[in-house]
Amino acid sequence: LLKGAGTATYYPVKSLRKSGDIDILIPDKLQFDKAVSVLELHGVVIMGEQHAWHHVEMHNENGVIIELHRALAEQFDDDDVNKKIEQYTEEMSVHNILKNIDGMNIVCPEMAWEALSLAIHMLHHFVRAGFGLKLLCDWVVFWNSEHDESQKNTFYSMISSIGITGFVKAVNIICIKYLGMKKENVFFMIQDEKTEVNTDIF
């Protein structure tokens, strides 16, 4: 499960985060095709107009939209970035945890991979699809929660490898200044040996 109900668990009141659809990541092509077939057997249909390559939109008779993701985002213009994201997306299948959400155990990414999916989702919307405040709110409540240091380090290693630390740092600085993000929780991402951050802006 990506975003949605999983991300809502970080909000002080889960219902504050409106979920427009259900996002499920299945990067393996055979499993992806099987998932589509299973959903169709249960009356879920593929929507007539598809707006993206990285997911297939389906809906049931009640109008609930399910997005089956074969990737975290559309392809970017940099092939090296795409290859790294694809690598980490495939690794997500073995970096899962069970979250109890409203009494149900749901498979969600481990913290580092959840953070990565949120970061890539923001980057996708920033570059391709329009950027909304909801993305920043998700990012703030996620990082205002307590997380394991080793998972934080894993996340930072991944975004460094992909080459998007600059984007993530810019988002963090905006969120600290305007949206109440806890600076101490993300300072490891906004200052390193290559970057001097003027803390007066906070």
State the predicted function of each range:
Residues 1-20, 26-202:
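Conserved NTP-donor binding/palm subdomain of two-metal-ion nucleotidyltransferases/polymerases, i.e.
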